[in-house]
UniProtKB/Swiss-Prot annotation:
Function description: Ion channel inhibitor.
Name the record gives this protein: U11-barytoxin-Tl1a
Compartments reported by the entry: Secreted
Annotated family: Belongs to the neurotoxin 10 (Hwtx-1) family. 25 (ICK4) subfamily.
Predominant subcellular localization, coarse grouping: secreted
Tissue spec: Expressed by the venom gland.
Keyword Disulfide bond: yes
Native organism taxonomy: Eukaryota, Metazoa, Ecdysozoa, Arthropoda, Chelicerata
Notes on the domains: The presence of a 'disulfide through disulfide knot' structurally defines this protein as a knottin.
Pfam families xref list: Toxin_12
Keywords carried by this UniProt record: Disulfide bond, Ion channel impairing toxin, Knottin, Secreted, Signal, Toxin
The species this protein was found in: Trittame loki (Brush-footed trapdoor spider)
Annotated signal sequence range: 1-21
C-alpha cells in the first residue's frame, strides 16, 4: 500500500514537471510570435524625439534668421514677446502633426 502511494505521488510529480516544461516552451513561442508581430508593424510603436526634424535645428526660443533654421512646428518670430530678447527667435507656429 505504501509503495502504491509512493508510485502515485512520484507519477503526479513527474506529470507536473512535464506539463510545466511544455508550458514554458509555449510561453517562449508566444513571445517570439509577439515580437514578430511587433516587427511587422514597421516601427509604428517606435519612440522618436518629438519636434526635431533635422540635425542642428534651433529649438524653442533659439536664435534664428529664417523659418528654415527652426525645428519642426517652430517658426522664426520677430515680435519681441519675451522681454529679454532683442533679436528673432524660434516659437511655435500653431501647426500640429507632421508637415
Amino acid at each position: 500500500m505504501k509503495t502504491l502511494v509512493l508510485v502515485a505521488v512520484l507519477g503526479l510529480a513527474s506529470l507536473y514537471l512535464l506539463s510545466y516544461a511544455s508550458e514554458v516552451q509555449q510561453i517562449s513561442r508566444d513571445e517570439e510570435d509577439f515580437r514578430a508581430l511587433m516587427a511587422s508593424f514597421g516601427g509604428i510603436f517606435d519612440t522618436e524625439e518629438r519636434g526635431v526634424d533635422k540635425e542642428g535645428c534651433r529649438k524653442m526660443f533659439g536664435d534664428c534668421w529664417g523659418d528654415g533654421d527652426c525645428c519642426l512646428h517652430l517658426g522664426c518670430k520677430t515680435r519681441k514677446l519675451p522681454p529679454w530678447t532683442d533679436k528673432p527667435y524660434c516659437a511655435w507656429d500653431w501647426t500640429f502633426g507632421r508637415k
